[in-house]
């Protein structure tokens, strides 16, 4: 499996939380004595879901969760034997596949072959641009869970703190999503 896997673990989004990395470390595999045969398939880097075929270990978890849990069938197996690959079903592009962008395939991928597009640099560029007004919206899930990452109790991890942090980073306006939900309720009466 390692001979067909891009082992650039340091820069991988799953580094430290990768099943293959864990197994390789547990078995004390440091060097790969086999010739690397990494196949890279083209992918639209503008799409919110990023697929890196060079990391795919063909475990089929994405295929199963998309079909059985979401009922969408975006992913499918192509080829047989050593030529087996996981790709968008029906020889379509991901844009044509009716992907709901639910993130289930990303969550179930054990090796980082599927991930969310990282727009961090774009955000920093927008904040640095004096001609742009940057607005941030904090979703309820983030509002309730962000303190966990920093070891803060629920009393310490307030909405005000995260909104203040966004303002200090340079965001012009920061809103809690519940604000817009309240406006909608008031509008619709």
Located regions from the model:
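Ferredoxin-type iron-sulfur electron-transfer modules and their immediate structural context
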Residues: 1-95
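Terminal amphipathic helices with adjacent charged low-complexity linkers/tails
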Residues: 16, 79-86, 95-103, 114-128
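Alpha-helix capping and helix-loop boundary segments enriched in small/acidic/polar residues
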Residues: 53-54, 89-100, 111-114, 150-157
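Active-site-facing alpha/beta catalytic cores
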Residues: 55-58, 101, 185-188
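Generic beta-strand/beta-sheet core signal
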Residues: 59, 69, 77-80, 89, ...
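Short coil/turn connectors at secondary-structure junctions
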Residues: 61, 71-72, 104, 110-111, ...
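Iron-sulfur-associated redox domains of electron-transfer enzymes in respiratory
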Residues: 115-189
